[in-house]
């Protein structure tokens, strides 16, 4: 009995040893499998990470080339959308804007003559720390020219100051704006237009008035409104018709008088001619032509309208120095309806 018990014990011990050995082998196999797989996985992950790092590596030149085709609006939209994704981009944009003088420098105009740098600093220092302040001074008088510049250290200070563009400085109301916007546009008053004058030098542009500004006077080339203090014409007036275009000498004679066409000459042209007695008259300055032109200047009119008479503007008057036909017919010189002349 004792022998059989010993044998059974030996068998149990052998079985337990074998099971323990099998367990150890299984554990070793399980430990060896991840060890064999880890080198492969680590190498693959390291290669992937190196590729991703090489793709995402920041290259300023490449980024500039990528952004070059975009317009300004597209770039602004791109930065705004990127700022929503990452706050770091927004903070970078704000930081760059704070460093830029464009958003921090203010132009102040409408200052009193007594304004000094200390006066301007006292007005704007409540909005933020001031980095620089300048009042432009006239060297001749030593007084302010009426404008100056204030530059804040931060963009926030300039933004706060511009919330109220009108500032009361001493006894005047000044206005401020960003200096990057340029000088303020000067207000244009309702000035009355100067005398209108016609240029007869370019009659080829008939019907196409071209307005020019010459020494404060409005000049119309070609057709347009006549420039006589006694008559206002238009582009359909016979003055600009065949009478002027058909005879260059006529246009030259009219231009010699400064372009002023009085009713007598305009009426003559409107009715198709100018009498020969008018052409040879000694009072050529009275019909809108410079007296210096003389008979030589209007000789072309006589040859062009010879044989045609000038319609009388005042039927009861005689402009040729004859006696009037009114009740006071004995009055000498020119008279109208019997009233003697003032000479």
Curated annotation (Swiss-Prot):
InterPro entries per UniProt: Nucleotide-bd_a/b_plait_sf, RBD_domain_sf, RNA-binding_reg, RRM_dom
Keyword check for Nucleus: yes
Keyword Glycoprotein tagged: no
PROSITE patterns per the UniProt record, alphabetical: RRM
Chief location of this protein within or outside the cell: nucleus
Localization per Swiss-Prot or TrEMBL: Nucleus
GO molecular function: identical protein binding; RNA binding
Pfam families named among the record's database cross-references: RRM_1
Gene3D superfamilies reported for this sequence: 3.30.70.330
Stretches with biased composition (Low complexity): 28-49
RRM domain sequence ranges: 104-181
Compositional bias (Basic and acidic residues): 319-330
Region annotation Disordered: where it falls in the sequence: 1-61, 312-343
Superkingdom in the source lineage: Eukaryota
Comp. bias regions, Acidic residues: 50-61
GO CC field: nucleus
SUBUNIT field: Interacts with UBA1A, UBA2A, UBP1A, UBP1B and UBP1C.
Cross-referenced PANTHER family: GEO13361P1-RELATED, UBP1-ASSOCIATED PROTEINS 1A-RELATED
Function according to Swiss-Prot or TrEMBL: Acts as a component of a complex regulating the turnover of mRNAs in the nucleus. Binds with high affinity to RNA molecules that contain U-rich sequences in 3'-UTRs. May function in complex with UBP1 and contribute to the stabilization of mRNAs in the nucleus. However, unlike UBP1, UBA1A does not stimulate pre-mRNA splicing.
Listed name of the protein: UBP1-associated proteins 1A
Annotated organism of origin: Arabidopsis thaliana
């Amino acid at each position: 009995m004792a022998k059989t018990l010993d044998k059974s014990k030996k068998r149990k011990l052998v079985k337990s040893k074998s099971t323990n050995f099998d367990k150890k082998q299984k554990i070793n196999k399980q430990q060896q499998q991840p060890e064999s797989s880890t080198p492969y996985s680590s190498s693959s992950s390291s290669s992937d990470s190196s590729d991703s790092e090489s793709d995402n590596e920041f290259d300023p030149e490449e980024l500039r080339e990528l952004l070059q085709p975009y317009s300004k609006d597209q770039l602004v939209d791109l930065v705004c959308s990127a700022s929503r994704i990452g706050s770091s981009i927004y903070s970078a944009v704000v930081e760059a804007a704070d460093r830029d003088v464009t958003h921090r420098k203010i132009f102040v105009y409408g200052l009193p003559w007594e304004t000094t740098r200390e006066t301007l600093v006292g007005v704007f220092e409540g909005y933020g720390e001031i980095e620089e302040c300048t009042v432009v001074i006239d060297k001749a008088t030593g007084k302010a020219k009426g404008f100056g510049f204030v530059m804040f250290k931060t963009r926030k200070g300039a933004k706060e100051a511009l919330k109220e563009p009108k500032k009361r400085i001493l006894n005047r109301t000044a206005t401020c704006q960003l200096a990057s916007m340029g000088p303020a546009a000067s207000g244009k008053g309702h000035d009355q237009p100067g005398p209108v004058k016609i240029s007869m030098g370019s009659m080829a542009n008939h019907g196409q008035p071209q307005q020019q500004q010459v020494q404060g006077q409005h000049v119309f080339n070609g057709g347009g409104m006549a420039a006589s203090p006694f008559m206002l014409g238009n582009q359909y007036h016979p003055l600009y018709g065949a009478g002027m275009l058909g005879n260059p000498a006529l246009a030259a004679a009219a231009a010699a008088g400064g372009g002023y066409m009085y009713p007598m000459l305009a009426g003559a042209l409107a009715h198709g001619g100018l009498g020969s007695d008018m052409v040879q008259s000694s009072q050529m300055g009275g019909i809108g032509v410079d007296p210096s032109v003389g008979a030589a200047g209007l000789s072309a009119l006589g040859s062009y309208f010879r044989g045609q008479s000038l319609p009388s503007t005042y039927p009861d008057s005689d402009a040729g120095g004859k006696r009037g036909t009114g009740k006071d017919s004995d009055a000498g010189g020119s008279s109208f309806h019997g009233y003697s002349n003032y000479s």
